[in-house]
């Protein structure tokens, strides 16, 4: 079992290091992922809520905000419990010579990715209320990639973040339906 975990860990380090080197060597990748990752910064959710109130039916906007807020209500305690149980160091801390940090991380530990889980909740809420918006599922993928390329998460951190976002959204939607 330990051998298997080491094998997976080495794959993650290699992927993270490779992506990070691409970011170091290519200004387009650097700026692209810096912009992408900011779409999941905490303050953007306030902007999304205000935009909803301005561009869509008031009742629909309120229902979306309630659904998203309930999902976040479940999300944050689980997120912090996972962070504090795993206490996984961020890639740039574990691999100081191979991986650079290109953004300021919002907290100390790596697992799970809060940017990925948060944007997943937001996008699933949008898809729930607006038909034909499945294309927006690309955003959690781009956010996840940005966190890897910018040196603050391993691939498994973003996968767990995505699953956490899906789970919290699902629980909230079950409660409200």
Please tell me what each predicted stretch does.
Residues 1-44, 79-102:
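N-terminal transmembrane-helix/juxtamembrane module of multi-pass inner/ER membrane proteins
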Residues 26-29, 59-63, 92, 130-135, ...:
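Membrane-helix interface segments
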Residues 46, 68, 72-76, 162, ...:
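Alpha-helical transmembrane spans of integral membrane proteins, capturing the lipid-embedded, hydrophobic core
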Residues 51-78:
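Interfacial segments of alpha-helical transmembrane regions
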Residues 53, 78-87, 127, 169-177:
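Membrane-water interface at transmembrane helix exits
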Residues 57, 84-92, 151-156, 177:
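Transmembrane helix-loop junctions in multipass membrane proteins, especially transporters and channels
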Residues 76-82, 144-148:
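Transmembrane alpha-helical segments that form the membrane-embedded catalytic/substrate-channel core
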Residues 96-177:
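Membrane-embedded catalytic cores of phosphoryl/pyrophosphoryl-handling enzymes
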């Amino acid at each position: 079992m330990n051998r298997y975990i080491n094998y997976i860990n080495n794959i993650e380090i290699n992927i993270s290091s490779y992506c990070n080197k691409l970011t170091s060597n290519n200004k387009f990748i650097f700026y692209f992922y810096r912009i992408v990752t900011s779409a999941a910064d905490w303050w953007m959710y306030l902007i999304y809520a205000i935009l909803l109130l301005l561009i869509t039916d008031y009742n629909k906007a309120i229902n979306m905000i309630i659904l998203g807020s309930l999902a976040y209500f479940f999300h944050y305690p689980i997120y912090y419990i996972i962070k504090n149980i795993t206490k996984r160091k961020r890639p740039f801390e574990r691999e100081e010579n191979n991986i650079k940090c290109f953004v300021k991380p919002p907290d100390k530990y790596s697992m799970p990715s809060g940017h990925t889980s948060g944007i997943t909740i937001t996008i699933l809420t949008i898809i729930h209320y607006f038909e034909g918006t499945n294309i927006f599922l690309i955003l959690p993928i781009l956010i996840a990639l940005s966190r890897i390329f910018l040196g603050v998460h391993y691939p498994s951190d973003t996968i767990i973040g995505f699953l956490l976002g899906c789970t919290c959204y699902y629980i909230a939607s079950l409660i409200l339906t």
